[in-house]
Structures are given as structure tokens and as C-alpha cells.
Amino acid sequence: MREMYPKKGRVILHVDMNCFFASVEIAHDSSLQGKPLAVAGNEKERKGIIITCSYEAREYGIRTTMPLWEAKRLCPQLIVRRPNFTLYREASFQMFQILSRFTEKIQPVSIDEGYLDITDCYALGSPLEIAKMIQQALLTELQLPCSIGIAPNLFLAKTASDMKKPLGITVLRKRDIPEMIWPLPVGAMHGIGEKTAEKLNDIHIQTIEQLAKGNEHIIRAKIGKHGVDLQRRAKGMDDREVDPSQMGQHKSVGNSMTFSKDMDEEKELLDMLQRLSKSVSKRLQKRTLVSYNIQIMIKYHDRRTVTRSKQLKNAIWEERDIFQAASRLWKQHWDGDSVRLLGVTATEIEWKTESVKQLDLFSFEEDAKEEPLLAVIDQINDKYGMPLLQRGSQLLRKQEKSFQQKLESKFM
């Protein structure tokens, strides 16, 4: 199959999952197959917007970022699911695991897309055959559809994957650029947003062809060096390489909660922080992962966002340790103002088998005693789907909260 690969240059695939969140929901619940489905915010709140929707929903004119009330007007029978980011992250993890069977040269771009450099993968088949194998594996094993672009560089591969959806495979060569890409408006080009398109329009650049053939000095003067990079890509030139080191950056496990109303009660916020820590812990343990860095995110009522992280000497994975790190960050950085969103994320992830928790003399005996107990508590709670068993510290905090509420209701 070596003859199917270029003697010089590279072969890049861009794998882009189709309607990812909606597709994951359908894979999780087959009764949604073939029906208009949207993943969106709370139906009861008019502020809810469409995060993504199925192709059946798009036939009614429903689009991403559309207000939910408008989507329901266009399609009264629209099925709405609240976003389940735990489910989506798990599906993303499985997706990249499948991609890693074909090559180690993988660069995640987001939760649902990534680049693969298959230049040296000729033993597996032609580029088109490899793309078909990837597409079939994702569809068979995860019930998730994707589109794949095949090209000599990252920009063209990304452009190609957008051309046929769903379940498309598109080959885009440099010689195809004048016919397939140049006639398009500059706003349709990957990497050009609305504001950049407006600036290019100001200097009479309307199409990608005009960008490719435009005066470099005028373009640079208008939008800087980024404009020159865009011009090179419009000509089909892109020297960026697939960066496998970003695969590690993709490995983060996090959960966040947006509150229906602003919260400023510290005990309630700490209780939520512990629930988020527990969720992160369970997902780490499910994947046999550990973390060396814990991060919290606080979004205030006025949309101010604070993100802080703590580097850890030892790898952690248990709820107790994650919550301890998160709560310390919280106490250091919460300014007392009311909060709309709270998040906990474990980063700098490694496989647990590759990492050893370095226990000091005082923590070793305590951890050794508690690990079997924590495992039993988690198993029983998971089996019955509810927190039947809890640690004493959790119960004590709940009792304090209940007692406080009774006092408030009696004397206020």
C-alpha cells in the first residue's frame, strides 16, 4: 500500500463527530433514533438555548444557539435532553481510545474532534481504507457517526471533514483548492470568524480566492500576522504538525454545576464542591486514572470567572483528597460574592498503573484502612443508585445544615 502514500509530504486525517452530544444521547437511548432531538438548557427557563441537535431536528430549521422556545415553536414534538457532560466525556475518551489503535500521532482539538497523522501507516491500508475502518469502528462500537477529511495538512483536512455530513469521507488535495475552496466566502473558511471576515470585507476581500491572491502587506496591516497565516492556508499551505503531546492535555476529568439561582451560602457551596469532587473521583477510578493537579472554577453572578489550580506532590484519585485540594483553593479564592457556577477538574492525568501514591508515615496506615471501606460504600451506592451509605463527616454536615434550616424557619 506504500504506493498509495506520497513520497514527500504527509497524510492527515481530521475526524469530526457528527452532532456529538445528540449522537451520544441516541447511542445511550435507542428510542431517540430517527426523532427530532435537541440537547439544551432547562425547558422551564426561557433562557435555555440549543447546544446541539440531531439532523432530524435540523430539518425543521433548528440550529445551535437558537433559543429553546423558538425551537419548540418550529417543532412542537421536539425531544429535549439536558446536557449530560459526564456521558459525553466518557464517549470522547472511548473515541480517542479507538483512534489510538491506528496511530500514536493524534492531536485532540476538542471533545469531539481530532487530527491523526497516518503518513507511516501504509501497512494498515490506503488512507481511504484507514478512514473507512475508523468510521466503521466508531459506528459499530460506540454507535457514533463521524465525518473524516483526508488531506496533506491540518487546514485542508479540517476543511474536507466539513464537506460531507453525516458519515462523510472527503479527500482534498492542493490541486482541488481553486475549484472546491476558492469560490467560497471568506467567512466560510476555517479560522475566520465574523469579526475577521468583516475586516477582510473592509479591504474588498470577499472570497477565499481573493484572500489567497490579495496583497500581503495590506492584509497584514489590517489584521496582523494572523492575516498572513490565513492567506497561506487559503493557498493550501499549512506547516503545522500533529502534536501528540496535546493528547495528555486532553486527559482531564471535570464536572461543573450551574445553579438555577445565585448561591452565597458557604456550607451549601462546599457541599456542592464535595459532590463535584465525588463525581470526578468516580470517573477517575472508573478509568483507572490519577491526577497531579486539581483545578476549581468559580463563576460569579456578574459573570466574573475565577479559575485556580493546585499542583500536587502526590497522585490522587479519591474523593477525600480531591475535595481537600478543591476546598483549600475555594477558601483561598472565594471573595464571598454570590456564585452561579462551580466546577472541579482533575488535570495532569496518568494511568494509575504508571503512578504510585507516595504516602507519608502518618497517612499510610489511615489510607490502607479506609480504601476497602470507601470501595464498599461506592459499590453499594452505585448498585442502588442512591447514597444509602455515607461517611460520618458527610452526615454531620447535612445534620448541621438541617438544624440551621429549622432554626431559620422558626425564628425568621
UniProtKB/Swiss-Prot annotation:
The gene is dinB. Residues 235-257 are annotated as: Disordered. Its EC number is 2.7.7.7. Residues 12-193 form the UmuC domain. It is an enzyme of class 2 (transferase). GO terms for cellular component: cytosol. The keyword Cytoplasm applies. Poorly processive, error-prone DNA polymerase involved in untargeted mutagenesis. Copies undamaged DNA at stalled replication forks, which arise in vivo from mismatched or misaligned primer ends. These misaligned primers can be extended by PolIV. Exhibits no 3'-5' exonuclease (proofreading) activity. May be involved in translesional synthesis, in conjunction with the beta clamp from PolIII. Mg(2+) binds at D16, D112. GO terms for molecular function: damaged DNA binding; DNA-directed DNA polymerase activity; magnesium ion binding. It catalyses: DNA(n) + a 2'-deoxyribonucleoside 5'-triphosphate = DNA(n+1) + diphosphate. It comes from Bacillus anthracis. This is DNA polymerase IV. Its main location: cytoplasm. HAMAP family: DNApol_IV (MF_01113). Monomer.
